[in-house]
Amino acid sequence: DSGSTVVALTNDRDTSYFGEIGIGTPPQKFTVIFDTGSSYLWVPSSKAHSMYESSDSSTYKEQDFIEATEEADNVFLNRLFDGILGLSFQTISVPVWYNMVNQGLVKRFSFWLNRNVDEEEGGELVFGGLDPNHFRGDHTYVPVTYQYYWQFGIGDVLIGDKSTGFCAPGCQAFADSGTSLLSGPTAIVTQINHAIGANSEELNVKFGLTPEQYILKGEATQCISGFTAMDATLLGPLWILGDVFMRPYHTVFDYGNLLVGFAEAA
């Protein structure tokens, strides 16, 4: 689309996708995961990869922030990226990309994640539009049901052509570019990992996953299931549609109309 900004993404073994951003003037460069499952911008200290020095920026403004000097988990240890840039809603925390919205620059953004780790182009994030080279047909759009994550309702979940019955009354899900796997209720994921075959149904449109799409390569001859169990939340049964789901489906996050759209990736 005219006026869109394209960010090239790097695919790290199908486990994470990250691209480059610049902070300040002149820009100090970082590689970050663009995460639709959070709203925070994490920039690590000099003890990690890159360091943001506010005094080197002519556009830096005093603002409230939280500095973590010690982290129990090894979040960024041995990672190829420096930090995380959240693309979710301000209910969690006011995200950086809201500045683009408030300036009238961006009403939507879209992801294409390349499954082929051998190709130079690992993926693509487009702020402000879509890249027609990376999807086929029309997108199926669903309304955002809760402005915390990019959350929407889904119908029944099938294993093969058989209903699991668990989500027949309806479940909630959100598309999360910062999560590697596809997480769902333990009862269903246990069945899926036993049968190793799954589909999700929404608005009478089926979005299927083939074994090539949900099985990850491990060491040597090892294969890893792309499904992981997660018990019910306060919002009820919840699915996190991570990169396993977003790779085969070009995904649009439409803030202007509060919609999430999926089309076959190309």
Swiss-Prot record:
pH-activity dependence text: Optimim pH is 4.3. Active from pH 3 to 7.5.
GO cellular component, one term: extracellular region
Tissues expressing this chain: Pistils.
Disulfide bonds: 167-171
Enzyme's top EC category: hydrolase
Posttranslational mods: N-glycosylated.
Signal peptide: none
Principal cellular location given in the protein's record: membrane
This protein's record includes keyword RNA-binding: no
Regulation affecting activity: Inhibited by pepstatin.
Location relative to the cell: Microsome membrane; Protein storage vacuole; Secreted, Cell wall; Secreted, Extracellular space, Extracellular matrix
Keyword Aminoacyl-tRNA synthetase applies: no
GO MF term (any one): aspartic-type endopeptidase activity
Similarity section: Belongs to the peptidase A1 family.
A single GO BP: proteolysis
Peptidase A1 domain: residues covered: 1-263
A Pfam family it matches: Asp
Function: Aspartic protease with a high preference for bonds between hydrophobic residues.
Subunit relationships: Heterodimer of a light chain and a heavy chain. An intermediate form is produced first, and undergoes proteolytic processing to remove the internal plant-specific insert (PSI) and the propeptide.
Name this protein carries in UniProt: Cardosin-G
